[in-house]
Amino acid sequence: DTIRPADMLGRWHGGEFVTGHAMNGLLTKIGWYGKNFISTSEVQPLVCRNDAGELYSNTEVGKGEASLWAVEFRGEVTASMVYDGQPVIDHFKRVDDTTVMGIMNGSGGLIGGRHFYFYLERDS
C-alpha cells in the first residue's frame, strides 16, 4: 500500500534485500542503522553506528540529508525521500503498521538499470 509522508515520521532501522545490485553490502560496511524522519523537511537518510555504537547521521556518504514528499512512482503517489546532495529518490510502500519497503530510484540510485531494494522497521 502507499503511505503518506506524515506517516513516515520517526526513527526506523533497516536492512537490504540481496538481489545482486552493486550496492548490496555497502550499507553494512558503513554501519548503516536506518533512517530518521524528523519532519517532512528534515530527514537523516543514512543513520549509522560509530565505533562506540552511537547513532549519527552520516552526511559525508549521504552527501547531505533529505526531505519527504508525496511523489508518483509506477502509477501511485506515495511517500518518497529526496536526497539533498545527490540525484536519488527513495520511494516507500507500506507492508504493515511498522514496516515499509523502499526502492532507490533516480540517476544516482539506478545502477546498471537496476533498482536497490531495502526495508525499514519503525523503532518502538
Residue ranges of model-derived segments:
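Soluble ligand-binding/transfer domains with enclosed cavities or grooves
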Residues: 1-124
